[in-house]
Structures are given as structure tokens and as C-alpha cells.
């Protein structure tokens, strides 16, 4: 027998020693059968050299079941693993959906801001032309002066009649100067010293003169003497009219008197 093996080219295998522990081949084949689905094709090819295995052999405990009831273990996933995978996928999706905010917004990515539209609603009350005296009353509180007089805001000197320009707008000091020189409303205003330009208002008819001044300006609201006196006291800042210590008395500046006299010579009263 040994000679025949040598002639055929097979290596000689010495007989097993008596010290070796024999093993149960049935137990080894049974364990191999249980892990057979996890063996690769390479492992199956090498296993043919060591033992004979029949893939259709079914364990004795499962002989009563049909063969088609068995599925390979690789296609079965435990429900615990599926839940774990789904939980991991949801966490990854949450991380991807969450925008990354830099630690310093000023140094990170720029965020574009959209302008907010603001609708302008029309005013409920009709627009009213503001007068010089009313504007001064809104911007400065009234001062406690005699006979209801108060400081206010009044624009600078305007154009005098006869001067070149588009539409002429008469000022309060010019309106009073024209009344004094024409003698109109002498019961409401009169000269104290014409040469010095000092004049005085009547304590009884001063409101009538103020009302006429409101009509001259075209104000919708009623003009009062308090508003008119506020504008006159404001002329003291620009120098056209100044307040005299005497009650209800004011004085024109020499420049206003000179310009008024020049205008009177150009356009004498009718």
C-alpha cells in the first residue's frame, strides 16, 4: 500500500500516534453544518479536502419541516438592529438639517437681510398750512410774560412790497408797519413815538388785529394775540422788532424803518 502511494506521487502520511486524542467526526460535521451559511465560497472549496459534507443534510430536529421553510440567516435582520439603524439615520439627518452657526457671527458667513416693507397710511386729518407763530408754539413753551405775551419762532425778515421776486410774502413786522403808516385799525395799534419806531397795541382790540393777521396769512385756525406776540418777541433775536419795558409796546429797528420808508416812497398809500 505504501509503495502504491509512492508511485502515484502522494506524500506518505505516518500512522497516527497512540498519544493523540480521537475526535468525534459526527460532532464536528454537526457544528460545521450549523455555521455553514457563514462560510465563504473559498472556505467551502477547501473543506472538500478534509471531509465530506452534504448541503441537503437537515438536522434531525428539523426533519419534520419542509426544506423550503428555511431561509438563509444573512437575509434576516433582527428588529433591534433595524431600530438602531433607523435611529442613527435620523440623527444623521438631524445633523445635516441643522445649520452650522460659527462661534463668531461677525467673522463667519454673512447672513442676508431682507428689507421689511412699511406701508404709509394717509393722515386722517387734512393737511393744514403751518404758520410762523404756530410753528413756534409747538417748538418752544410759552413764557410767563405780561398780557399773555410769549416768545416763539418766526422766520427771518421777508421780502418787502416792491422788491423783485416771484410771489411776495409779507411778514408780521411789515404788516404792522403798513397798518401804522396807513392809519388802518388805529383803535388796535398806534404810534407811541414814530421817529423812534415805537408802537403799542390796544388791550381791548388786540384780538381783532390778531384775527386780521390770521386772515392775511390764510391760516385756517384762529389767530390769537398770544401767538402774534410770540412771533414779535422772536424778532428780537434777528433785530427787526424788540420788546420795550412798557406793557404791549414794541419798537422797530432803524433798518426796518428805513426800508419801510423807501417802500412807502415807491408805493405811496392811496
Swiss-Prot record:
Disulphide bonds annotated for this chain are none
At which residues is Phosphoserine found? 140, 146
State any GO BP term from the record. Answer: positive regulation of microglial cell mediated cytotoxicity
Listed Gene3D superfamilies: Winged helix-like DNA-binding domain superfamily/Winged helix DNA-binding domain
Xref: InterPro entries: Ets_dom (IPR000418), ETS_fam (IPR046328), WH-like_DNA-bd_sf (IPR036388), WH_DNA-bd_sf (IPR036390)
Known regulation of activity: Transcriptional activity at macrophage-specific genes is inhibited by interaction with GFI1, which results in the inhibition of SPI1-induced macrophage differentiation of myeloid progenitor cells, but not that of the granulocyte lineage.
Keywords for this entry?
A: Activator, Developmental protein, Disease variant, DNA-binding, Nucleus, Phosphoprotein, Proto-oncogene, RNA-binding, Transcription, Transcription regulation
Instruction: Tell me what induces its expression.
Output: Highly expressed in both FV-P and FV-A-induced erythro-leukemia cell lines that have undergone rearrangements of the SPI1 gene due to the insertion of SFFV. Negatively regulated by microRNA-155 (miR-155).
Changing residue 241 to G has the effect of:
In AGM10; very low protein expression, if any, in peripheral blood mononuclear cells; when tested in transfected cells, decreased transcription activation; in vitro, fails to bind PU motif-containing DNA probes; does not affect interaction with IRF4 and IRF8, nor nuclear localization
- Low complexity compositional bias, start-end: 153-164
Disease linked to the protein = Agammaglobulinemia 10, autosomal dominant: A form of agammaglobulinemia, a primary immunodeficiency characterized by profoundly low or absent serum antibodies and low or absent circulating B-cells due to an early block of B-cell development. Affected individuals develop severe infections in the first years of life.
Subunit info here reads: Binds DNA as a monomer. Can form homomers. Directly interacts with CEBPD/NF-IL6-beta; this interaction does not affect DNA-binding properties of each partner. Interacts with NONO/p54(nrb). Interacts with RUNX1/AML1. Interacts with GFI1; the interaction represses SPI1 transcriptional activity, hence blocks SPI1-induced macrophage differentiation of myeloid progenitor cells. Interacts with CEBPE. Interacts with IRF4/Pip and IRF8. Interacts with JUN. Interacts with RB1. Interacts with TBP.
Q: What does this protein do?
A: Pioneer transcription factor, which controls hematopoietic cell fate by decompacting stem cell heterochromatin and allowing other transcription factors to enter otherwise inaccessible genomic sites. Once in open chromatin, can directly control gene expression by binding genetic regulatory elements and can also more broadly influence transcription by recruiting transcription factors, such as interferon regulatory factors (IRFs), to otherwise inaccessible genomic regions. Transcriptionally activates genes important for myeloid and lymphoid lineages, such as CSF1R.
What's the protein called, per UniProt?
Transcription factor PU.1
The organism that produces this protein has a lineage beginning with: Eukaryota, Metazoa, Chordata, Craniata, Vertebrata
Q: What is this protein's gene name?
A: SPI1
